[in-house]
């Protein structure tokens, strides 16, 4: 029983570490996108936003991905492009 608990705790710690790494990657990408947008002319920003939104619109829904997840992704991309980090 102790081995089972120890193994579960170890797996939980691994998952937490993976989660931290993913969060760091997302934060880094947000910083990069924000910096790029801030250094672009307004018309170039809008062109990029339109292209990204167009690409998202054209993506075919995947039955294996829940609609809520797809909508969450779309909302987050829009938020990032229209209101980058301060």
Swiss-Prot record:
Pfam families cross-referenced by the UniProt entry: Anti-adapt_IraP (PF10796)
GO cellular component, one term: cytoplasm
Keywords: Coiled coil, Cytoplasm, Stress response
Induction: By phosphate and nitrogen starvation, and in stationary phase, via the alarmone ppGpp.
Ranges in a coiled coil: 1-36
Database matches in InterPro entries: SigmaS_Anti-adapt_IraP (IPR019732)
Compartments, record wording: Cytoplasm
Gene Ontology MF, one: anti-sigma factor antagonist activity
Gene Ontology biological process terms in this record: cellular response to phosphate starvation; negative regulation of protein catabolic process
Lineage top rank: taxon: Bacteria
Leader sequence residues: none
HAMAP family to which the protein is assigned, alphabetical: Anti_adapt_IraP
Family to which the UniProt record says this protein belongs: Belongs to the IraP family.
Function comment: Inhibits RpoS proteolysis by regulating RssB activity, thereby increasing the stability of the sigma stress factor RpoS especially during phosphate starvation, but also in stationary phase and during nitrogen starvation. Its effect on RpoS stability is due to its interaction with RssB, which probably blocks the interaction of RssB with RpoS, and the consequent delivery of the RssB-RpoS complex to the ClpXP protein degradation pathway.
Subunit structure: Interacts with RssB.
Protein name (record): Anti-adapter protein IraP
Encoding gene per record: iraP
């Amino acid at each position: 029983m102790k081995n089972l608990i120890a193994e579960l705790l170890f797996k939980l710690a691994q998952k937490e570490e993976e989660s931290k790494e993913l969060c760091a990657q997302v934060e880094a990408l947000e910083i990069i996108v924000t910096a790029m947008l801030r250094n672009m002319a307004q018309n170039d920003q809008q062109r990029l936003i339109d292209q990204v939104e167009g690409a998202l619109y054209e993506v075919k829904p995947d039955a294996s991905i829940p609609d809520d997840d797809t909508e969450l992704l779309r909302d987050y991309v829009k938020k990032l492009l229209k209101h980058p980090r301060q």
